[in-house]
């Protein structure tokens, strides 16, 4: 029989061994963290690091070794990360709300950027508001929105350190929890990158000390590498030979196959190229402080033991270009260098060192942050959470070694600006259908018999002419027009005097009857006032009229109507003379007119004249030497552009003088500003009953006048500042030796460069999948671009002419769907079977039939054999 104390001793030994094993289990760092996190039910911390204007295509991430070690080697790298708009404030608004630009209505860096409308409708629905209401300690540090003025603290943020207005590194103002705080130019206390890094670290440590069980959300929004590109002093000597920005598209200009600003941007001058080199160098220098900031935040997470319970996201609001396609600097283009951004994620269950090829967008950040926090994603957010793309610990069937590809989007929308509202006089029911290319429409018209004769038919207005290169063109018939009773004759009969084709001037008959006649400028003005009614007289000359030819609208200036003494008629050497001049009596119905003496030839340029018979004659060298012809044509184009700018300025001044005209004194009129002013007020309307309907038009007129005055103020301001760089319709800048205040300094003097245009409004479809990699863009001007990035990764050639009409039509339909989408269900098209497409010879229609979705009712392109593909299409 065993001693009675033996079982007790064995029991105590077993108990001690179990306690030692449990202690060893808890000593393992990973298991300890997971055990404690599950026990305490702590949600993960979230840190979003956002940079301003940071590119991927120009190699900015190559110098950030600390960030790449922390985020790329320790987390997931999304190699196909894009923004849906390459503009600061619109993109940041999309990041906050998870919506496309057309759904949060912030189209530019000025319009609706931090406006009262934005504050009321969208700022109250940012991801910070949702997380703050569920217990997160939320904090924002750095640049917010371009037009944020610091007058309030946006909702959803417990700690707020927001930068007023645009990015700066020194001499800026912060709004710290509602109190404005000015900073100077001392690096140790004022350098923005270091300041917001230190503030964010201090906030995180304090939050974990005071509220250890509450998760933290922090947004650290850096100004780098945005201008003015002021680097920290210790980095001002780095990268003297930076050349990552010199890509195949660098200084690739002009580009006649691209949209307007690209066509008129020439190669850069040497001073511009030197500026791009220094700009790239200074941008990289500013990013070194961001690199240090990432290391500081990482070390803080390690010290506090929160690294394994924190998601870190690193990205930018959009990309940048430096010298690409001849553009000295800037953003706002739909190309890869402006829409691709860095995108890294590190956190729990994220596979370290992984590359993810799925498309992620800036509108995915808000849904992802909500998903990480365990919150439901609102249905009005257009983006979707990428958390399921990161989870590496979900169980996988061991009998299926090859993972099934996740269903994800393959296309997205890139948009900039908005389409201006049409005038009331424009077409209201404009068909949403595509047109054939212009050359095809002209070719079809030239097949008709009425356009194949050389202006010989009665009432013929156009003729088809084949130029030296074999291209068919529609030319307006010169000489007197023979109206055949069409509507066009009635429309012009009120403006064109019905005289003989040899003279549109009034006959000044002497008492003797048949002499020559001449009529000076003053006489012609009197005749015009006498012959025409007041309703047809205008103070401003009519610029153009729209002439319709078989359903096609051609805008033709009235000065091109064949009238004698018209100095703007086109002329080609060797063109046949009109044979209809001798038969002019039938046109006017007034019989023949006596002959008159014609004026002498008019000298237009130093090499070209307008002869007595209204024809243009130039030196023979221009018809023989191609180089001489080009040089003279460029000279004429320059003169025309100069005169147009001068005319525009004169019209602005004329409008100003009309508004500031002094009133004439009427001694018999009772002064309105008298002591009986109140008794003189009319209780009813003073307008004539026939004039009451014009009140709405008067309001429109007042709005136009306000715009006119605004333009005039800008013009006067430019003149006062001696600003010769600004050009109408272009966004230009002047750089000089005083722009950069920190080393390295610019010493090569001032220069001017233009970076964008007012008509640079577009909507693009970007698609990446196993069979396609393209960019399809429609511009507000009607221009279309298509780039196949599989064969042209730098988008050097517009390949829209290689597409069939059916493919163009399908691309247009898909783009229109995305332009009107709302919510993640509509805004995330995906392919159900990526193996189907053009690889096996199938059509694009077969490829798209797997992406059919239910969309709101909208006008679809018609299936006409001929006609426009869509309104505004330009081949």
Curated annotation (Swiss-Prot):
Q: Where is this region: Hydrophilic domain?
A: 416-720
Name a Pfam family for this protein: DUF3740
- 3-oxoalanine (Cys) modification sites are 88
Keywords linked to the UniProt accession: Calcium, Endoplasmic reticulum, Glycoprotein, Golgi apparatus, Hydrolase, Metal-binding, Proteoglycan, Secreted, Signal
Q: Where is the signal peptide?
A: 1-24
Please list the residues annotated as glycosylated: 65, 112, 132, 149, 171, 198, 241, 539, 566, 588, 613, 722, 759, 769
* MF term (GO), any: calcium ion binding
The EC category is hydrolase
Residue span of region Catalytic domain: 1-415
The primary location reported for this protein is: endoplasmic reticulum
Q: What is its EC number?
A: 3.1.6.1, 3.1.6.14
Coiled-coil ranges per UniProt = none
Cofactor(s) the record lists: Ca(2+)
Q: Which Gene3D superfamilies match?
A: Alkaline Phosphatase, subunit A
Name its cellular compartments.
Endoplasmic reticulum; Golgi apparatus, Golgi stack; Cell surface
The cofactor note reads: Binds 1 Ca(2+) ion per subunit.
Identify the residues that bind Ca(2+).
52-53, 88, 317-318
Sorted alphabetically, the Gene Ontology cellular component annotations on this record are: cell surface; endoplasmic reticulum; extracellular space; Golgi stack; plasma membrane
Q: List every stretch annotated Disordered.
A: 560-595
Q: Which family, according to UniProt?
A: Belongs to the sulfatase family.
What is the recorded name of this protein? Extracellular sulfatase Sulf-2
Q: Which organism is it from?
A: Mus musculus
- State the encoding gene: Sulf2
């Amino acid at each position: 029989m065993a001693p009675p104390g033996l079982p007790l001793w064995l029991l105590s030994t077993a108990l001690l061994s179990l306690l030692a094993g449990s202690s060893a289990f808890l000593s393992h760092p990973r298991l300890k963290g997971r055990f404690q996190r599950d026990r305490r039910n702590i949600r993960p911390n979230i840190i979003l690091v956002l940079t301003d204007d940071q590119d991927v295509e120009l190699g900015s991430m190559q110098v950030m070794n600390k960030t790449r070690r922390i985020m790329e080697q320790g987390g997931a790298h999304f190699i196909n990360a894009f923004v849906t708009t390459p503009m600061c404030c619109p993109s940041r608004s999309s990041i906050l709300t998870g919506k496309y630009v057309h759904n949060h209505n912030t189209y530019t860096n000025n319009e609706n950027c931090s406006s009262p409308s934005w504050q009321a409708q969208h700022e109250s629905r940012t991801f910070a508001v949702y997380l703050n209401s569920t217990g997160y300690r939320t904090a924002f540090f750095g640049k917010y929105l371009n037009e944020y003025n610091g007058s309030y603290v946006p909702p959803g943020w417990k700690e707020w350190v927001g930068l007023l207005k645009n990015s700066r590194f020194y001499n800026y103002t912060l709004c710290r929890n509602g109190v404005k705080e000015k900073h100077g130019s001392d690096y140790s206390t004022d350098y923005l990158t270091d300041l917001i890094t230190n503030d964010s670290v201090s906030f995180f440590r304090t939050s974990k000390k005071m509220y250890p069980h509450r998760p933290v959300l922090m947004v650290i929004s850096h100004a780098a590498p945005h201008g003015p590109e002021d680097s920290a002093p210790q980095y001002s000597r780095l990268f003297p030979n930076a050349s990552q920005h010199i890509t195949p598209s660098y200084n690739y200009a002009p580009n006649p196959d691209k949209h307007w600003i690209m066509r008129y941007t020439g190669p850069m001058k040497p001073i511009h190229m030197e500026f791009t080199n220094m700009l790239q160098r200074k941008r990289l220098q500013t990013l070194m402080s961001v690199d240090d900031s990432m290391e500081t935040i990482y070390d803080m997470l390690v010290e506090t033991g929160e690294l394994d319970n924190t998601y870190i996201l690193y990205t930018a609001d959009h990309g940048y270009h430096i010298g690409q396609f001849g553009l000295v600097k800037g953003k706002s283009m739909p190309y890869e260098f402006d829409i691709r951004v860095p995108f890294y994620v590190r956190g729990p269950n994220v596979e370290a060192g992984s590359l993810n090829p799925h498309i992620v967008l800036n509108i995915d950040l808000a849904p992802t942050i909500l998903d990480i926090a365990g919150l439901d994603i609102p249905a009005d957010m257009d983006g979707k959470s990428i958390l399921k793309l990161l989870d590496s610990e979900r169980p996988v069937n061991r009998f299926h070694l090859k993972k099934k590809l996740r269903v994800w989007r393959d296309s997205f929308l890139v948009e900039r600006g908005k389409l201006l509202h049409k005038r009331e006089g424009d077409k209201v029911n404009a068909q949403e259908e595509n047109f054939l290319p212009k050359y095809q429409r002209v070719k079809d018209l030239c097949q008709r018999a009425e356009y194949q004769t050389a202006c010989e038919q009665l009432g013929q207005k156009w003729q088809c002419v084949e130029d030296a290169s074999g291209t068919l063109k529609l030319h307006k018939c010169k000489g007197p027009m023979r109206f055949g009773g069409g509507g066009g004759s009635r429309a012009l009969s009120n403006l064109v005097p019905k005289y003989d084709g040899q003279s549109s001037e009034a006959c000044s008959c002497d008492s003797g009857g048949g002499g020559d006649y001449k009529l000076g400028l003053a006489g012609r003005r009197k005749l015009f006032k006498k012959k025409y009614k007041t309703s047809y007289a205008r103070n401003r000359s009519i610029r153009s009229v729209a002439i319709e030819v078989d359903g096609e609208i051609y805008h033709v200036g009235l000065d091109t109507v064949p009238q004698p003494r018209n100095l703007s008629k086109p002329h080609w050497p060797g063109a046949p003379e009109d044979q209809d001049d001798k038969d002019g009596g039938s046109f006017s119905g007034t019989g023949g007119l006596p002959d008159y003496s014609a004026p002498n030839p008019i000298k237009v340029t130093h090499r070209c004249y307008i002869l007595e018979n209204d024809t243009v004659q130039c030196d023979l060298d221009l018809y023989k030497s191609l180089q001489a012809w080009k040089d003279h044509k460029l000279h004429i184009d320059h003169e025309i552009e100069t005169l147009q700018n001068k005319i525009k300025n004169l019209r602005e001044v004329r409008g100003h003088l009309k508004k500031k005209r002094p009133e004439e004194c009427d001694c018999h009129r009772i002064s309105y500003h008298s002591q009986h002013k109140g008794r003189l007020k009319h209780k009813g309307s003073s307008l004539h009953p026939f004039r009451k309907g014009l009140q709405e038009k008067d309001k429109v007129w007042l709005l136009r006048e306000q715009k006119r005055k605004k333009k005039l103020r800008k013009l006067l301001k430019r003149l006062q500042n001696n600003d010769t760089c600004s050009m109408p319709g272009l966004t230009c800048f002047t750089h000089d030796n005083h722009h950069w205040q920190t080393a390295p300094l610019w010493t090569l003097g001032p220069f001017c460069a233009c970076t964008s245009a007012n008509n640079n409004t577009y909507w693009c479809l970007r698609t990446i999948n196993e069979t396609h990699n393209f960019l399809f863009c429609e511009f507000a001007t009607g221009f279309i671009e298509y780039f196949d990035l599989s064969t042209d990764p730098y988008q050097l050639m517009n390949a829209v002419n290689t597409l069939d009409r059916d493919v163009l039509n399908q691309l247009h339909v898909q783009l229109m769907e995305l332009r009107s989408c709302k919510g993640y269900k509509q805004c995330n098209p995906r392919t159900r079977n990526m193996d189907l497409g053009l690889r096996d010879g199938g059509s694009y229609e077969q490829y798209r039939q797997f992406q059919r979705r239910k969309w709101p009712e909208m006008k679809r392109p018609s299936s006409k054999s001929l006609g426009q593909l869509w309104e505004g299409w330009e081949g």
